[in-house]
Amino acid sequence: MGIKISIKSMGMSFYIPIIFNSLLIPLIVFFVARTGNEYNIAFAVNVLTQMFTPFFGSFIVCMHMSKYIDTRGNEIYFVLNKNKSHEIMKLFLVYIMTNTCWFAAYMLLDRSFGLEWLHIIIVTFLFVSATYCFCFFFRSVSLASIPGFLYTIYSVVGLKYLGKKFSYYEQTGMEAEKLSSKYVYFIIAAIVLMSIGNALNDSYDKYNE
């Protein structure tokens, strides 16, 4: 399935994250920037993008995979091309591209947001890979959406109580040293989950009558 058909088949579900990331977040950052306080600007960009951009990546995967997993007669979608990983990766790239221009604008305010954008890309890749994997593992899109939601809550809200070791939330922004150490493991985890998802996809045989 081509990327245009994939987006069209999702309807407004695809555009909800785009509108949020490309309209609401920049609008909030714009109003914060008017205060002239660099700390507040950095805090707004870091908190809002880390809370919502990766999770919405997971949301897009769920909306796209629903027709393959949950709909009646879903076997028809697996006749010509059973493996859906290439569709997921195309959606991931389009989603990232729609957000890149805004981070370029944020970099005009603070060049360090370039590292933050790499951080967001890595974490979003992890969310996308995990959701793709869980769709076939649980054989349910609804169940597949839960881990990403819980991980977001753990990282952003439960940080003080459960520790920082597995959290992706970086309230003070991203540092090059941390990006090249801790987040290498995030990339590896994302690749492993995508590979497991591929294997589960290839062996998938649950078709709804």
Where does each model-flagged region fall?
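Hydrophobic alpha-helical transmembrane segments
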Residues: 1-51, 56-67, 125, 133-141, ...
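Aromatic-anchored segments of alpha-helical transmembrane domains
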Residues: 24-33, 98-105, 149-161
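Non-cytosolic membrane-interface motifs at loop->transmembrane helix junctions
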Residues: 40-49, 113-121, 170-178
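Helix-loop-helix units of permease transmembrane domains in multi-pass membrane transporters
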Residues: 62-95
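Membrane-helix interface segments
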Residues: 84, 113, 140-144
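Hydrophobic alpha-helical transmembrane segments that constitute the membrane-spanning cores
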Residues: 85-115
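Hydrophobic alpha-helical transmembrane segments and immediately flanking/interface helices
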Residues: 112-134
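Transmembrane helix segments
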Residues: 141-183
